[in-house]
């Protein structure tokens, strides 16, 4: 999948490890401060508990990250659930792939 340039993509956040891809240097600096570590082509960080996950989601929303849409508990589905229960109160963006090099970005 071809990722958009100058963006931050949340690839996983519902599991035990948060996975983020970015080519934005300022965002990478924030990820380091949040204890993310660089692994090959992406940033990863263990999620301690649900409060930790919610804090990460909040920070990534503030960074205007794109939350990947997909099946099951995709990052976008998790953020939407948090909005439904009132713990995320601001808008966010999602990305869905329609093909290997075709994606759609939506504002929610």
Where do the model's predicted regions map?
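Accessory DNA-engaging acidic/polar modules
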Residues: 1-108
């Amino acid at each position: 999948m071809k990722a958009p340039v100058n963006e931050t993509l949340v690839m996983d956040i519902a599991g035990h490890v948060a996975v983020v891809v970015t080519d934005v240097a300022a965002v990478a600096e924030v990820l380091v401060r949040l204890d993310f570590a660089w692994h090959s082509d992406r940033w990863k960080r263990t999620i301690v508990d649900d409060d930790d996950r919610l804090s990460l989601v909040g920070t990534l929303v503030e960074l205007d990250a794109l939350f990947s849409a997909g099946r099951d508990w995709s990052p976008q589905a998790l953020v939407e659930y948090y909005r439904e229960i009132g713990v995320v109160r601001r808008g966010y963006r999602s990305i869905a792939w329609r093909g290997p090099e075709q994606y759609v970005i939506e504002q929610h």
